Amino acid sequence: MAKEQKSNNGANLGFEAKLFLAADKLRGSMDASEYKHVALGLVFLKYISDAFNTVFEKLQADEFADEEDAEEYLAERTFWVPKEARWGHLQANAKQPTIGKLVDDAMLAIEKSNASLKGVLPTNYAREALNKTMLGELIDLISTIGMNEESDKSKDILGRVYEYFLGGFAGAEGKRGGEYFTPRSIVRVLTEMLEPYKGRVYDPCCGSGGMFVQSEKFVVEHGGRIGDIRVYGQEMNNTTWRLAKMNMAVRGIDADIKWNNEGSFHKDELADLKADFILANPPFNISDWGGDRLREDVRWKYGTPPASNANYGWLQHIIHHLAPNGTAGVVLANGSMSSNSSGEGDIRQSLVEHDLVDCMVALPGNLFYGVTIPCCLWFLAKNKNTEGFRNRKGEVLFIDARKLGTMVNRVVREFSADDTAQISDTYHAWRGEEHAIERRGEYEDVSGFCYSASLDEVKTHGYVLIPGRFVGAEDEIDDGIPFDEKFASLRDVLSEQFAKGKELED
């Protein structure tokens, strides 16, 4: 067995996990939802300081360049970091009682010097409630990231650490963490199936930007160029938007991410965008989305979604933003596959009849932090006869992946690389893609796992899109709506029916 290296150079097995455990230990009794901003802000600060140092050293070696000229860094697409904001200065003062103010001053100086970061960075490290000894120890810990590495390697490691920390804090927060972080297992399935090699990538409820990070990884891993994709997103939670902006910066992703507190439904900041790929994990079964104020909206081409549930609002918002040959992958509650409430069944029928549904995937439970219920993936296609794929018009692929994945602890399930490949290769082989056919062979229906259905068959099933009904597996559908909400809704419906019955009697 190889000896474990002592420096955190990224080669160690479970390096990010060990670092997160050490950082998490320092938070003591502080709530994870608060502590994540402390830790992630510092990781970001270390990242841009390391990136700055890479250019700084390059300019120092050039006798005709000025390493203290901010314009030189702009030309290198690197953030300018004033002297008082550089990591070395903070590390040297980590044990000082004024370290909180020094970090705040550093954040403000960086925002002032870089317009794209204005209003993004956390600036409350000096608050009395934040333990300054803990803060100093956290700075020392983060200082070890990328130690003894070249600057470019250090930047990559910091990007990985930021992503791992996001996931770690989401896990610690449980259900709340799912509001800004989509589990990697789900994001990988989405990106591997959609294959966003080139074009415009959009997420209308982007959280901390995980869909964009994985899209960038996909391009790199498959030999593409990062410059071939352009990223667009919108987020209505300002705190989460800040996390996303920092996440994009530490990954070196040029992203156009908008924020307003009304959200994509009521103030679509990217109204004219037509995207080639849309990846989204909208909040499930949202009842207070203001749908009653959007009854005649142009996006509701396939039917007006109920004011009591935004699921079909999200699907139609996404379809509205697809380019003529665009494809989308959307995470939704299982109830979206079968609900007939308030006209949802009619909308689903219209989506099927307009041949927009390409593939449905049933997922197992426990993929989300703090949520045991399973969910599903909708894959939508504006055109099922695009160049490079076989003509799939009039067909829908159903995949039941509920038996895949492994419980990595008592409450969380994850997909292995083989699990992800089994799902995505099945889809690609069905679409007639050579690379998948070479690995898996020609597409064939597999009892209990996958089935290619005609639209007539879907009609026979009443336009219910539950994969288990098509592949030959039993239904285990949980619509994700808490019992008390469901009970209250049914009670209201019953009361309404009683009232109508009384009117008829009178």
Residues of each region from the PLM?
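Non-catalytic, mostly N-terminal accessory regions of nucleic-acid modification and defense proteins
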Residues: M1-Y197, D256-E269, A362-N366, N383, ...
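Conserved Class I SAM-dependent methyltransferase catalytic core
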Residues: K25, E34-Y47, W241, P306-L380
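Short, contiguous acidic/charged loop-to-helix segments that flank catalytic cores in large enzymes
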Residues: S29, W289-N309, G335-E344, P364-G370, ...
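Conserved nucleotide-binding/hydrolysis micro-motifs of P-loop NTPases
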Residues: L45, N238-T239, P283-I286, N334-M337, ...
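Conserved S-adenosyl-L-methionine
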Residues: R176-A280, N285-W289, L294-E296, A333-G335, ...
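Feature representing long, continuous alpha-helical segments
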Residues: V213, R242, A280-P282, Y312-Q316, ...
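Active-site lining segments that contact anionic ligands and/or coordinate catalytic metals
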Residues: K274-A275, N309-N311, N325-T327, V331-A333, ...
